[in-house]
Amino acid sequence: MFENINEDRGQVGIGTLIVFIAMVLVAAIAAGVLVNTAGFLQATAEDAGQQSVNKVTNRVDVVNAHGLVNKTGEERTVDQIFLTVRLAAGSGSVSLEDTTVKYLSETTARTLTYNDTVTGSDTADPANLTTGNNFTAGVLEDGDDSFEVLNEQSDRAEMVINTSTVEGDNTNGTATGQTVKLDITSRNGGTAQVILTMPQQLAGKDNNDPIAL
């Protein structure tokens, strides 16, 4: 009788041990899965955070803007827009070749991409902007000859938009009093916005006269 009791106790002990080992293995596997998941989530969060930082910091600032007057008969418009840009504070490098400009006026909405029209002296030639889907740029200051990439705070470039071609046929540019909104977006998604209002009066201005915007 007592021998049977001892055998039963031994079987129960072995069974309990097997169950315990199985529980330990399951817990270890679960812990490994949790660690891997946590690592993946952390890496994903870091990537998303870096992308958000890039969108905020990797962009240009518009230092100033001016236009050129187009005089056709008695009509005067602004047919070219010039923007002096530099890197925003804390920004990484920005390639103008990979930059887009969203152009929005009272009559036109377009997304402009970069068109290399510079001459041998890195001066932009707006006359070569023959389609309404492009902007161009020239170098103003570039200490390491990296243009069309802005990679130092001292770098300056001049972005040029030919509003006559952007606004389309039968126009000579943007009319007096008209507002143009420009969203300049780098490859990383960082955006600088500038809103320009054309002067109310251009009387007395001749063809190609500069005008502050």
UniProtKB/Swiss-Prot annotation:
Predominant location category: other
Record-level GO BP terms: archaeal or bacterial-type flagellum-dependent cell motility
PTM entry text: Glycosylated by a pentasaccharide similar to the S-layer glycoprotein, probably comprising a hexose, 2 hexuronic acids, a methyl ester of a hexuronic acid and mannose. Glycosylation is required for biosynthesis of stable flagella.
Keywords for this protein: Archaeal flagellum, Glycoprotein
Glycosylation sites: 70, 115, 172
Keyword Zinc-finger recorded: no
InterPro entries: Flagellin/pilin_N_arc, Flagellin_arc
Subcellular compartments: Archaeal flagellum
Outcome of mutating residue 70 to Q: Defects in flagella motility. Decreased glycosylation
GO molecular function, one term: structural molecule activity
Propeptide regions on this chain: 1-10
GO cellular component terms given for this protein: archaeal-type flagellum
Phenotypic consequence of gene deletion: Cells are non-motile. Cells lacking both flgA1 and flgA2 show defects in motility, whitout affecting surface adhesion ability.
Lineage: superkingdom: Archaea
Biological function: Major flagellin required for motility. Not involved in PibD-dependent surface adhesion. Much more abundant in cells compared to FlgA2.
Family from the record: Belongs to the archaeal flagellin family.
Xref: PANTHER family: FLAGELLIN B1
Name this protein carries in UniProt: Flagellin A1
